[in-house]
Regions:
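Active-site beta-loop-alpha junctions enriched in small/polar residues
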Residues: 11, 44-46, 76-81, 104-106, ...
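Small/polar (Gly/Ser/Thr/Ala-rich) solvent-exposed segments
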Residues: 101
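A short acidic, helix-capping loop that chelates divalent metal ions and anchors anionic groups
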Residues: 45-50, 107-113, 177-183
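Auxiliary Fe-S-binding modules of radical SAM enzymes
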Residues: 25-35, 59-71, 85, 89-95, ...
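Conserved glycine-rich "GG(E/T)P / GGGxP" loop and the immediately following alpha-helix
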Residues: 39-59, 148-153
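Active-site-adjacent beta->alpha loops and helix N-cap segments on the catalytic face
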Residues: 48-59, 83, 109, 116-124
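Canonical Radical SAM [4Fe-4S] cluster-binding loop centered on the CxxxCxxC motif
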Residues: 1-23
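Short, flexible active-site-proximal loops enriched in glycine and acidic residues
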Residues: 3, 31-40
């Protein structure tokens, strides 16, 4: 990954290796060997590439679908550096059930939690446009808690996400990958998660976890 978000255990590389032309085939073959009925394809940020990696991601998913025609596919995508042209190229004709991109944290904590090149608003832009150009695909995002946010900010963030047309949301407890990462601010009680679940369903999310 070319970014250095302060919550994430994935390593940061300033000069990543070249794309592997064999990756689409290897990915498709791995999914076939595992006998999966549903697969989530997760990617890293590749700000070094002109399209943020979109064309390679598309090649991977198309190969997976061709090799495994009965497998449901979900893409957990980067923000493609906010490049809507890359997003449109990626999603055109792509055999996806779910397009996911994570807002990660409430807007106030962007500068603390995420790489400077990422933001809540940019993530919303990606999610909103994905729904506009492919209304047949379910959109999904995730929000971490335990980073210093308030309960009110979580509710406000969910409202903004829903207004962007996002269909599904997950809320999860942040866990510190190492002492070099952000410390945990709190562990909300299960009752808090139940309250957020209710709020999300009232807002109209089709699935909440």
């Amino acid at each position: 990954c070319t970014r250095g978000c302060r919550f994430c255990a994935v390593g940061t590389v300033r000069t990543p290796p070249e794309l592997d032309p064999e990756e689409p085939k290897e990915l498709a073959d791995a999914i076939k060997r595992m006998g999966l009925s549903y697969a989530v394809i997760t990617v890293v940020n590749r700000d070094d590439l002109y399209d943020g990696g979109a064309s390679h991601y598309k090649d991977c998913i198309q190969r997976v679908s061709e090799t495994n025609p009965g497998v449901g596919l979900e893409l957990l995508c980067s923000d493609l550096d906010g490049n809507l042209d890359s997003l449109e190229m990626l999603l055109e004709g792509l055999p996806l059930k779910v397009f996911a991109h994570n807002v990660e944290c409430v807007p106030r904590l962007d500068s603390v939690v995420r790489d400077p090149r990422a933001s809540f608003e940019q993530s919303l832009k990606i999610l909103r446009y994905a729904k506009e150009i492919r209304p047949d695909i379910m959109t999904k995002t995730s929000l971490m808690v335990g980073l210093g946010e308030t309960d009110e900010e979580i509710s406000e963030a969910m409202e903004m996400v829903r207004e962007a047309g996002v269909d599904m949301i997950t809320l999860g407890q942040y866990l510190q990958p190492s002492i070099r990462h952000l410390p945990i601010d709190r562990f909300p009680e299960p009752e808090s998660f139940a309250d957020w679940d209710g709020t999300a369903r009232e807002l109209g999310f089709r699935a909440v976890a």
